[in-house]
UniProtKB/Swiss-Prot annotation:
Cited function: Hydrolyzes malto-oligosaccharides, but has a low activity toward soluble starch.
Residue positions with a glycan: 36, 124, 143, 218, 347, 422, 506, 534, 537, 545, 550, 559-562, 571, 601, 623, 835, 881, 895, 899, 957, 970
Protein name: Alpha-glucosidase
Superkingdom of source: Eukaryota
GO biological process, one term: carbohydrate metabolic process
Source organism of the structure: Aspergillus niger
Amino acid sequence: MVKLTHLLARAWLVPLAYGASQSLLSTTAPSQPQFTIPASADVGAQLIANIDDPQAADAQSVCPGYKASKVQHNSRGFTASLQLAGRPCNVYGTDVESLTLSVEYQDSDRLNIQILPTHVDSTNASWYFLSENLVPRPKASLNASVSQSDLFVSWSNEPSFNFKVIRKATGDALFSTEGTVLVYENQFIEFVTALPEEYNLYGLGEHITQFRLQRNANLTIYPSDDGTPIDQNLYGQHPFYLDTRYYKGDRQNGSYIPVKSSEADASQDYISLSHGVFLRNSHGLEILLRSQKLIWRTLGGGIDLTFYSGPAPADVTRQYLTSTVGLPAMQQYNTLGFHQCRWGYNNWSDLADVVANFEKFEIPLEYIWTDIDYMHGYRNFDNDQHRFSYSEGDEFLSKLHESGRYYVPIVDAALYIPNPENASDAYATYDRGAADDVFLKNPDGSLYIGAVWPGYTVFPDWHHPKAVDFWANELVIWSKKVAFDGVWYDMSEVSSFCVGSCGTGNLTLNPAHPSFLLPGEPGDIIYDYPEAFNITNATEAASASAGASSQAAATATTTSTSVSYLRTTPTPGVRNVEHPPYVINHDQEGHDLSVHAVSPNATHVDGVEEYDVHGLYGHQGLNATYQGLLEVWSHKRRPFIIGRSTFAGSGKWAGHWGGDNYSKWWSMYYSISQALSFSLFGIPMFGADTCGFNGNSDEELCNRWMQLSAFFPFYRNHNELSTIPQEPYRWASVIEATKSAMRIRYAILPYFYTLFDLAHTTGSTVMRALSWEFPNDPTLAAVETQFMVGPAIMVVPVLEPLVNTVKGVFPGVGHGEVWYDWYTQAAVDAKPGVNTTISAPLGHIPVYVRGGNILPMQEPALTTREARQTPWALLAALGSNGTASGQLYLDDGESIYPNATLHVDFTASRSSLRSSAQGRWKERNPLANVTVLGVNKEPSAVTLNGQAVFPGSVTYNSTSQVLFVGGLQNLTKGGAWAENWVLEW
């Protein structure tokens, strides 16, 4: 391995404390921070989470539930009145005495159940009702009826109201509240559903956790700016899950015997049935997975459940996206290239150097990004004119665009509010927003003023009718100064570095330094490295350890071991939104909802408190940014947005990155399950900060991670301020590993793009779990260390240090599936259900092609623009039955409504391959070659539409059974898909 000390000797490597001195406080003189917000400003109340509180009441034990009456049936379902079945328990709020139940069979595969208060008015409607202007509800189809539904609802009043959602085909209860009580209060709702003994649930995000949810998990859902802690609430809110159940039986005769995945035998035949459940709610949530039950708890809102009957996992995802939250946005072709970013690029020259180094080492680069370093005083839409001047930027970006590359800057959710006593501190963006009065308010009507990077800040009120136009206009104004190609929308949970409106009365202290040390400042030098760094870099590790110990000793503080917890006693008819009586296990200090966030009492223009819509802030900001980019590009170019906080449906506007992860092997490991979850949520454009964000990376970790992320839809390297540089050209072995994986990625970009078109038009997934692609194999239910890219490619990455092999399973082997090694093109010899040991030395990532698929490919290049100008190739991997199929979608790669498109279908048999194209997009590049895997005998001749292919261009390997047909350019000069053709051998 190349040691760190050797790397530091290389002239083009930036020193360890990369950019710290310039980037931390580098702003124009009038905006130099002189005041540091005290750390106490972000200290909230000390609360104890209900699940950890020995004094907490169990609502199931003390609440009476409800009784149903006045049932009225209609063609699409029924309604009923629910009345409290006893004395109010008021355990975590005020009981709602009268509820209305609505059951609607919305389509053959979709059912909706609503339970909402019967009596509300304008003063409390937002406590329970989520406006359809914010989150649309799924609509019933014209032909929907009870008789046509896959599902059926039954209910009972014994001992209190409960209901079941039953799959007609099996009689299984997919959702059952039998034996439990419904608790419905103004700040607390609880309902419980039964689950099978050994259940397989996926989703319920956002969390860093196992792909198949643990059966004793406590899942808090409340968007939070808190890095990427394991098993805690993160940035987004996705109260949707997939439930897969396995059976031994026969669909034809209706025989279904439940099977536990842990007891399944890979040599046996099974079937599976999956369904999905979505809770349309934007309040804080807690979902407790227990033995044979799931407990839903919310801090408000209503019960608005939609059930999707599947029965395959792919069906569930399609039903959820097409009917309820919206189909994913179609991405620009170029966004599938490689993206490079870091917090600490100090000026345009730094960016130019990075681009030059990618070219020097011939590593593909599509997008260069900047973090908050470019900003004037960390203000949105305003460049630092000393380091990121508009004139220098225009020159740099012109050259960047000429080279076929692009630029994305970060934009934060908060906006600086200038110092009223400093005329030089003027900020036009704030002035325009204030003129339109589009910022969040305190309950008394004054501005809510929090604190983020620039100091004291205000926050757009997305409920204000002028807010989206204001935001869009700021993007348009800025775009005339900086020719950016997308937006990275951050800090949108929405984050604030203090509790409450801490800037009220303190604006004369602006600009202000955050209440915590920034990376690289004295006391926060980054000494952390990956887990195995001490083994492979002993000298450097010892030095880092000594530095860390010294820093820890210098900054050590004493803490009290005695903690007094604040507990809120419910007041009848009154809500306490800052400290609700029920305390969710929120992963901020003290579990206080106001810590490191805009307070729940911040008020929107329509009177709605942030408490009721907290989960939507980032979602609405993504919509505003999407609308803004439409204006920037005159509704011609697809907006490219990567956002941090997301909600159900955010995928129709943006992609998502995994947040502030760590340069650790465990962080790389969990990136797969996080990506698969976001596939489920309908946000396929997902990627993790490759090589890790927090802490220093090292050669081995970055080597493996650059290869893993090459198969994620969004592929970006990013790290934090003051850590060592980790661009892929920093280590010799990483250069080669990156180029090796990128050669595959860039070759299959047409396949990736086709997958995105299918996701955008049908609701299919791009990155897939093995259990979704092979739904009838229970042994795959928990697999999270390998994954599929579409239906054709399987990736088996190395996820631990100091190894040269990896274990991988080959699904379907023994049941007709054939797998081919990408590199050797030979069929894999594997046994059913066996974790096969695969050679994987550093720099090699095992990749396999599934038999039965045809991949359209082009030659790799340094940019996607260059790659799109290269000849075509096809890789046809024959299945065990000697057939294969595939498809290709093409357009101009960026238009929202392309003037011309092309769809190509490919089919292959044991002796031929056919191409059939439809559409008006003119693809001029010829077909160069076709490779067919699994050809069991050497052909005597090869023809294309009856014309003989020159024998010298045809090779056959009898050992690997690979047929290669080259020399096709002259036969396809008009374009590979200009006419339909058949290749015969």
